[in-house]
UniProtKB/Swiss-Prot annotation:
Encoding gene (name): trpD
Pathway: Amino-acid biosynthesis; L-tryptophan biosynthesis; L-tryptophan from chorismate: step 2/5
Positions with a binding annotation for anthranilate 2: R180
Name this polypeptide is given: Anthranilate phosphoribosyltransferase
Cofactor or coenzyme needed: Mg(2+)
UniProt: anthranilate 1 binding residues: G94, N125
Binding locations of Mg(2+) 1: S106, E239
Gene Ontology molecular function: any one: anthranilate phosphoribosyltransferase activity
Length: 354
């Protein structure tokens, strides 16, 4: 079987699971074509649970490369329901897996970003490391997520923000669900969501809980020509966090540059993670409403910072990274304080339920 990838390349037909697993067990890297072949078999429903689990564990134990993850992403896109949203778009998302059970910072940030006038196409799913996932909270806020791909695009045009529910746009991932659940461990699959937005956005802010995977994610985005900020809190959060210092991988013009970041450098205090702790979807939705109504505190500060990260990815402006983030924090704060962010959510609710 040939695997036709989105960039037009074909993989070599004569491959086998032993031909991939044995090199991985010897610590040898695979090519993008080889991992694309494996993912194509998985997403076609032609791989057994044992083959899926063996591949996922062997790849993670060996340590993924940019080429290997790129191959997985290409195959996922080949099986995805992709969409085209006109104009410049941005996404903000975390990989999950930090086990911190925080409120939905990236989801609230997406609404704030839309309030600044940027067009947001968020890609998300049920809970990974938050107490509830982005989709759970958005449904509690009144956003209708049960939309066809065409309606998802229409909502983006009408409201300036839309949501791609992963299970609807990547239905072939169901073939890996049983093996992933039975493994119960973090594998490469956990970082593929942020790399496979169905709208193929070109600007992203991506939080990565796994320190080893953050530069890999940045490398994949760089190879695609995306503009992005990839980050990880030094305490393990998949956010540009206010609970600690962070590492940031700035992706621009095909180049990745790693920088340290301290929230105190933009005037934000370091707070305990308990200040960002969430609960169920109803609680987290209420936190979002209070944020949009102008409530001050640690949640607002974290949302402003992460909103700023996405705005920098979309349009960095001038100066150092710290200066860029400081400038965008002011833009995000104005979106909340003027009521524009709350209006963006109201437009989203109305458009998605029309």
């Amino acid at each position: 079987m040939n695997v036709v990838t989105p960039n037009g390349g074909d993989s070599v037909a004569a491959r086998s699971w032993p031909g991939l697993l044995n090199p991985l067990l010897r610590g040898e890297d695979l090519s993008a074509e080889e991992t694309a072949w494996a993912m194509d078999r998985i997403m076609s429903g032609e791989a057994t649970d044992a083959q899926i689990a063996g591949f996922a564990v062997a790849l993670r134990a060996k340590g993924e490369t940019v080429d290997e993850v790129t191959g997985l992403v290409r195959a996922m896109y080949a099986h995805a329901n992709t969409i085209e949203v006109p104009g410049r778009t941005v996404d903000i998302v975390g990989t999950g897996g930090d086990l911190a059970k925080t409120v939905n910072i990236s989801t609230m940030s997406a609404i704030v970003i839309a309030g600044t006038g940027a067009k947001v196409v968020k890609h998300g799913n049920r809970a990974a490391s938050s107490a509830s996932g982005s989709s759970d909270v958005l449904e509690k806020l009144g956003v209708n997520l049960e939309l066809t791909p065409r309606r998802v695009v229409e909502v983006a045009e009408a409201a300036g923000i839309t949501f791609c529910f992963a299970v609807k746009f990547h239905p072939a991932l169901r073939y890996a669900a049983k093996a992933r659940k039975e493994l119960g461990a973090q594998t490469t699959f956990n970082i593929l969501g942020p790399l496979t937005n169905p709208a193929q956005v070109r600007s992203q802010a991506v939080g990565v809980a796994d320190a080893r995977m953050a530069p890999i994610v940045a490398g994949v985005l760089a190879d695609r020509g995306n503009s992005a900020l990839v980050f990880r809190g030094d305490d393990g959060l998949d956010e540009l966090t206010t609970t600690a210092t962070s590492r940031v991988w700035v992706v621009r013009d095909g180049v990745v540059r790693e920088e340290p970041f301290d929230p105190r450098d933009v005037g934000l205090p370091i707070v305990p993670v308990e200040a960002l702790r969430g609960a169920d979807a109803s609680y987290n939705a209420d936190v979002a409403r209070r944020l949009l109504d102008g409530e001050a505190g640690a949640v607002r500060e974290a949302v402003l910072l992460n909103s700023a990260a996405a705005l920098v990815a979309l349009d960095p402006g001038t100066g150092t990274l710290t200066e860029q983030l400081a400038a965008k924090i002011l833009v995000a704060a104005e979106a909340i304080d003027s009521g524009a962010a709350k209006q963006a959510l109201e437009r989203w609710i109305a458009a998605s339920n029309a």
